[in-house]
C-alpha cells in the first residue's frame, strides 16, 4: 500500500471512530482540523445556531494564498446506525476485514473526506500551495435539516473574501463501481400538501355528511394524470410522487371531516418552483371545480432548485483522472436526490464524485480499501492537473 493510500485509509478509520450522528460532531472535525493544521492548512471551526435547531459545528480550512482556488466540500455528520447488534462490527469501530472498512459513514462520506485530505496534504507537502489554493468546506449538518451547515458556511466564507473557482463534493456518486458516475447537477425538490374539506357524519347516514376522500382521490388523479414534462438532454422527466394520504380517523363508522395528501416532486430545469406550483394549482382547480370539492393546495418553501454544471474543461479534467485510475469513462448524471451542491452552485461550478453508494445508510455500511486508495489517487491526479 502506498503512503497516500495508507494515510487515506487510516484517516477514514479514525473519522469512523467518532460517532458524529447529526447534530453531534463527537470530535470528528477537531480530529480532521488537527491533521490539516499539521500539514500547513489554516483552519476555522465555525458554529452556527438557529432557534429551531441544534447548534452545528462546521470546519473551513485553507492552504495557499492566491492563484486558482479549488474547494472540497463534504459532511462529517452521519445518519444513526440503527440497531448496533445487527452490524457485523461496531458501527463506530472503523474495523477492517476482507479488504473492507466497516462503519457508519464509510461511504457517506468520511471515506471521501479522508481520501481528499490525504491527497491535499501530500500535495501541500510537495509545495503545491505555491501554485494555488486548496480549501475544505466541511459541515456537520447535511443529514439533518441543513439549516446550520453548508449554506451558512458558504456565506461566512464569502463574507471573509473567499472566492472559489471550482468545487468537488465528495458524495458517493457511483452506482456499481468506482468511476462509473459524476454528478454534474441535481433535480429540484418541492413538497406539497393537498387538503379537501368535507362534513363529518355517521356512515349509516351519508346524506347528512360529505365524504372528502373520493374528492381527494379525484384531485390526486388529476395531478398525476398527465406527465409534467418529457425530460431534457441532461435530466429525466419530472416526477410527482404521493407519499401519504391521511384522514385521522381510527374508526369504521365515522365519515371524516377532512382528507389530506402529501407529495413530493423531483423536477428538472424546465421548471422553477413557482411555475410548477402554478401548473399544479391549475390542474387541481380544474378538477376541483368539476367535482365540486373545497380544496387547498399548499407548497413548502423550496431551497432545492434544479441545476446543472455544463460540461467544460474542468469536467474533462476530472473525468480523465477517473478514467486513468479506473479504466472507466464516467457517466455525467443529474439523477438521484438533492445534495449540498444546491448551495454551492451559487458560488462556483461544482461536480460531485466520491465512493460507490450501494451501502450508504445501510446496516454494515462499508467501503473497499482499494476504492478509498484509488479515490485518493484520483483526487491527487485532479490536484496535480488542476494546478499544473
From Swiss-Prot:
Cofactor or coenzyme needed: Zn(2+); Co(2+)
Broad class of enzyme this protein falls into: hydrolase
UniProt keyword annotations, A-Z: Amino-acid biosynthesis, Cobalt, Diaminopimelate biosynthesis, Hydrolase, Lysine biosynthesis, Metal-binding, Zinc
EC number assigned by the record: 3.5.1.18
A single BP term in Gene Ontology: lysine biosynthetic process via diaminopimelate
GO MF, one annotated term: succinyl-diaminopimelate desuccinylase activity
One Pfam family linked to the record: Peptidase_M20
Bilayer-spanning residue ranges: none
Binding site for Zn(2+) 2: 108, 143, 361
Free-text comment on the cofactor: Binds 2 Zn(2+) or Co(2+) ions per subunit.
Enzyme active site: 77, 142
Pathway(s) annotated for this protein in UniProt: Amino-acid biosynthesis; L-lysine biosynthesis via DAP pathway; LL-2,6-diaminopimelate from (S)-tetrahydrodipicolinate (succinylase route): step 3/3
Keyword Hydrolase tagged: yes
InterPro entries: ArgE/DapE_CS, Bact_exopeptidase_dim_dom, DapE_proteobac, Peptidase_M20, Peptidase_M20_dimer, Peptidase_M20A
Catalysis performed (reactions): N-succinyl-(2S,6S)-2,6-diaminopimelate + H2O = (2S,6S)-2,6-diaminopimelate + succinate
Keyword Zinc annotated: yes
Binding site for Zn(2+) 1: 75, 108, 171
Described function: Catalyzes the hydrolysis of N-succinyl-L,L-diaminopimelic acid (SDAP), forming succinate and LL-2,6-diaminopimelate (DAP), an intermediate involved in the bacterial biosynthesis of lysine and meso-diaminopimelic acid, an essential component of bacterial cell walls.
Family indicated by similarity: Belongs to the peptidase M20A family. DapE subfamily.
Subunit structure: Homodimer.
This protein's name: Succinyl-diaminopimelate desuccinylase
Source organism per UniProt: Methylocella silvestris (strain DSM 15510 / CIP 108128 / LMG 27833 / NCIMB 13906 / BL2)
Highest classification ranks of the organism: Bacteria, Pseudomonadati, Pseudomonadota, Alphaproteobacteria, Hyphomicrobiales
Gene: dapE
Amino acid at each position: 500500500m502506498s503512503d497516500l493510500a495508507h494515510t487515506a485509509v487510516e484517516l477514514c478509520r479514525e473519522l469512523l471512530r467518532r460517532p458524529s450522528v447529526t447534530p453531534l460532531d463527537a470530535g470528528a472535525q477537531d480530529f480532521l482540523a488537527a491533521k490539516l493544521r499539521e500539514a500547513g492548512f489554516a483552519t476555522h471551526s465555525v458554529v452556527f445556531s438557529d432557534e429551531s435547531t441544534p447548534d452545528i459545528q462546521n470546519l473551513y480550512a485553507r492552504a495557499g494564498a492566491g492563484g486558482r482556488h479549488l474547494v472540497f466540500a463534504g459532511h462529517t455528520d452521519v445518519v444513526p446506525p440503527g440497531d448496533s447488534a445487527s452490524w457485523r462490527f461496531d458501527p463506530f469501530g472503523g474495523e477492517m476485514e476482507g479488504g473492507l472498512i466497516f462503519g457508519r459513514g464509510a461511504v457517506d462520506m468520511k471515506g471521501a473526506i479522508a481520501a481528499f485530505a490525504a491527497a491535499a496534504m501530500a500535495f501541500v507537502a510537495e509545495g503545491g500551495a505555491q501554485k494555488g489554493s486548496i480549501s475544505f468546506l466541511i459541515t456537520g449538518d447535511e443529514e439533518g435539516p441543513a439549516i446550520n451547515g453548508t449554506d451558512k458556511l458558504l456565506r461566512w466564507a464569502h463574507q471573509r473574501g473567499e472566492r472559489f473557482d471550482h468545487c468537488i463534493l465528495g458524495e458517493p456518486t457511483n452506482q456499481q463501481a468506482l468511476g462509473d458516475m459524476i454528478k454534474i447537477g441535481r433535480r429540484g425538490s418541492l413538497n406539497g400538501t393537498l387538503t379537501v374539506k368535507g362534513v363529518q357524519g355517521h356512515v349509516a347516514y351519508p346524506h347528512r355528511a360529505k365524504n372528502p376522500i373520493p374528492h381527494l382521490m379525484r384531485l390526486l388523479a388529476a395531478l398525476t394524470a398527465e406527465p409534467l414534462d418529457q425530460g431534457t438532454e441532461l435530466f429525466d422527466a419530472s416526477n410527482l410522487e404521493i407519499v401519504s394520504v391521511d384522514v385521522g380517523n381510527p374508526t369504521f363508522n365515522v365519515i371524516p371531516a377532512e382528507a389530506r395528501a402529501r407529495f413530493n416532486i423531483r423536477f428538472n430545469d424546465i421548471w422553477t418552483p413557482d411555475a410548477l406550483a402554478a401548473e399544479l394549482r391549475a390542474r387541481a382547480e380544474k378538477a376541483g371545480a368539476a367535482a365540486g370539492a373545497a380544496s387547498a393546495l399548499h407548497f413548502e418553501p423550496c431551497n432545492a432548485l434544479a441545476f446543472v454544471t455544463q460540461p467544460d474543461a474542468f469536467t474533462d479534467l476530472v473525468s480523465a483522472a477517473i478514467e486513468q485510475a479506473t479504466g472507466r469513462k464516467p457517466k455525467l448524471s443529474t439523477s438521484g436526490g438533492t445534495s449540498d451542491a444546491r448551495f454551492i452552485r451559487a458560488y462556483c461550478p461544482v461536480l460531485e464524485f466520491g465512493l460507490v453508494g450501494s451501502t450508504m445508510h445501510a446496516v454494515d455500511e462499508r467501503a473497499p480499501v482499494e476504492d478509498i486508495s484509488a479515490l485518493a489517487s484520483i483526487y491527487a491526479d485532479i490536484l496535480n492537473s488542476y494546478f499544473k
